[in-house]
Amino acid sequence: MARWNVCSYCGREFEPGTGKMFVRNDGRVLFFCSSKCEKYYFMGRNPRKLKWTKAFQEARLQRAKRK
């Protein structure tokens, strides 16, 4: 069984054969589940400020634990 990829921007898992793989000049590999994630990454948007990303949801849980 093939390994599922994890989006480098939003953290969502997606099936192999879908999405895009981007290889940076330093050799680091980035996977994107959608063109939306890819565009937001290259525009420099912070995933912790977008409610639909896993990074935002994890940060929100950490803030709730502190209170």
UniProtKB/Swiss-Prot annotation:
GO MF annotation: an example: rRNA binding
Note on cofactor: Binds 1 zinc ion per subunit.
Cellular component terms (Gene Ontology): ribonucleoprotein complex; ribosome
Zinc finger boundaries on the chain: C4-type: 7-37
Record carries keyword Ribonucleoprotein: yes
Gene3D superfamilies, alphabetized: Ribosomal protein L24e
Alphabetized Pfam families for the sequence: Ribosomal_L24e (PF01246)
Gene Ontology annotations of biological process type: translation
Entry-linked CDD domains: Ribosomal_L24e_L24
Sites where the protein binds Zn(2+): C7, C10, C33, C37
Obligatory cofactor(s): Zn(2+)
Alphabetical UniProt keywords: Metal-binding, Ribonucleoprotein, Ribosomal protein, RNA-binding, rRNA-binding, Zinc, Zinc-finger
Subunit: Part of the 50S ribosomal subunit. Forms a cluster with proteins L3 and L14.
Job description of the protein: Binds to the 23S rRNA.
Family to which the UniProt record says this protein belongs: Belongs to the eukaryotic ribosomal protein eL24 family.
NCBIfam families: PRK14891.1-1
Name the UniProt record assigns to this protein: Large ribosomal subunit protein eL24
Gene: rpl24e
